[in-house]
Every structure is written in structure tokens, then in C-alpha cells.
Amino acid sequence: MLIASFVNGVAILLAAFGLFALHAVEIWLWAALYLLLNAFPNLEQALYFSTSTYVTIGYGDVVLPVGSRILGVIEGANGIILIGWSTAFFFSIVDRLKLLERDLEKG
């Protein structure tokens, strides 16, 4: 059963890192859109704004131009939805792995 626990731990870590990577890709895509629209002068500001908006921190020290502020609202809503979905998905994986481990212990 030690092997099953190890495999489950690895699967959980892979799921967590995979979801983190997908969120990072989403943040980079939003930053690329902001650069494409010339909303920010460089990648650093675009990524900073995108990250703080995606995770709904929004410090307010870097803002979008007036004509494209609705994109920030959309990204924030997108981040809330996808982080919530990812959390539910992650705990679904953990629950299924625990059930599988329990079934393996029963024989």
C-alpha cells in the first residue's frame, strides 16, 4: 500500500503543477493581448497587471487605458471562474485517488 500512496502523491503533485501551469499560460495570453493592443509599454508591466488582475488582487498601481478597461474586468472574472473550477477539479482528483487507494487496501 506504500506504493499506492506514493503514486497518489505523485499524481496529486502533477495535477497541482499542471493546473498552475495552465493558469500561468492564461496569464501570459492576457499579457500578450495587452501588448498587442499597446495597452502597456513592455512585457513586465503587462505580466504584472495580468497576474494581479487574474488573481483579483488589482493593486491599482498599473492600470489599463480608459478605452480598454473592460478587458481587465473580463480577465478578473475569467480568473475567478477558472481558479474556482481548478479548485473543484483538483479536489475531485484527490477524492477519486483516495477512493482508489481505499479500494486497493480492501483487496
Go through each PLM region and give its residues.
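Hydrophobic alpha-helical transmembrane segments of multi-pass membrane proteins
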Residues: 16-24, 74-81
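Juxtamembrane/transmembrane-helix boundary motifs in multi-pass membrane proteins
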Residues: 2-14, 40, 63-71
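Cytoplasmic (intracellular) domains, linkers, and terminal tails of multi-pass ion channels
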Residues: 1-20, 83-107
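Pore domain of cation channels
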Residues: 45-101
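Outer-pore turret/helix-boundary of cation channels
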Residues: 20-49
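A generic structural signal for ordered alpha-helices
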Residues: 3, 11, 25, 32, ...
